[in-house]
Regions:
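Blade-loop segments of beta-propeller domains
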Residues: 77-80
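Conserved "HGTGT" condensation-loop signature of ketosynthase/thiolase-family condensing enzymes
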Residues: 1-75, 96, 108-176
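Short conserved active-site loop signatures built around small residues
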Residues: 84
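A short, small-residue-rich loop immediately preceding and capping a beta-strand
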Residues: 101-108
């Protein structure tokens, strides 16, 4: 199998950008990542674009138009909280399988206000699943409580994860 390497990364500063489209936001991050490794848009052989909120809007294809690259395969990924990670994994897998040599993985989202970025309003996600919670944090909280009951995990141990994550975010000048 072919080796796969991450050769360029970047991200835009977290924030709200009401004057910009999701593809424009993703294009900025994509160009910054390409600049980081000295590649050009012409080097890209495929795009794996993670986006959940506007998933029906062909964000990947529109992102490519923004950066001036068309005519290459695009895979748009929507997988709840794992959307970006899934796009990255699929990009990696395409290289490992020998399908491509240079691919771009982008995760981009523009959340609205409200539950799940406003996507849980009328016709959206109100309640679902056995827990009837409708939000991933509530579902993860239930999973955590079950883990604690079954394994003796303490609230202090869960809190340490939050502290660790916050400490890591303080090292990122682009974090909120």
């Amino acid at each position: 199998m072919t080796d796969a390497y991450i050769v360029g990364v970047d991200m835009i500063k977290f924030g709200r950008f009401p004057d910009r489209t999701v593809p424009q936001i993703g294009a900025q991050a994509a160009l910054m990542a390409l600049d980081d490794c000295g590649l050009t848009v012409q080097d890209i052989q495929a795009l794996y674009c993670g986006n959940l909120g506007q998933a029906s809007g062909m964000v990947g294809q529109r992102l490519l138009q923004e950066i001036g690259q068309t005519g290459i395969p695009v895979v748009n990924v929507a997988n709840a909280c794992a959307t970006g990670a899934t796009a990255f994994r699929e990009a990696w897998a395409s290289i490992k399988a020998g399908l491509h040599d240079v691919v771009l993985a982008v995760g981009v989202e523009q959340m609205g206000k409200g539950l799940l970025g406003g996507g849980a309003g009328a016709g959206g996600i109100a309640k679902e699943g056995l827990l009837g919670s409708g939000t991933m944090p509530a579902i993860f909280a239930e999973a955590g409580m079950e883990h604690a009951r079954n394994n003796g995990t303490t609230f202090e141990q869960f809190a340490k994860v939050s502290v660790k994550n916050h400490q890591h975010s303080t090292l990122n000048p682009k974090a909120m």
